[in-house]
Amino acid sequence: EPEFISLSRDHVHVTETEHLVYQVPDHRRERALVRLLEVENPASAIIFCNTKAHVHFVSVVLQRFGYDADELSADLAQNERERVLQRVREGNLRYLVATDVAGRGIDIPDLSHVIQYELPEDPESYVHRAGRTGRAGATGIAITLISGITDKLALDRIAKRFGIAFEERALPTDADLEAVVAERVTALLEARLRERDSIQHERSRRFAALA
């Protein structure tokens, strides 16, 4: 069931959010992230990392896989930061990769997903991150990648402190990915066929009027 969480001190609220957890090998986090993005296919997402180096790495990986992704960290020059923020304001950026500090104060309307590439060092930051999605009665999804017993214990402490029911899931398999891709290709082809039929119908109607 969706969790109802609020952190009123900073006006952060999570109205209805699913909290999903994926256990992944630490050295394959980026591959796991790409796999999840393929299956979840969010319209927009913030991907949180703990360090500026990880923000840059994840952003580059996503771009190389063809995703519309950009980064936001303290290392960015002011003009680059403004460029990224402008894309966010205009709704022209699909995936924003950011640190907690750089992402503070950024509001993306109708954000469906928050993805935590790694658990935050401060447990309270989890609620701040997850609070970016599931607003105004909408259902949001907060995904967290964890690796090893240390992460698992940290997650348990977050669950206990904030009363969050995490749902642990297995990563999508190759078969899952193939099924998702096939479904999207089929939907695309059907949409194009409907569009073609609609155009042909309109042409027939016009020619009939000329006869």
Language-model segments: what does each one mean?
Residues 1-209:
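Conserved helicase RecA-like core
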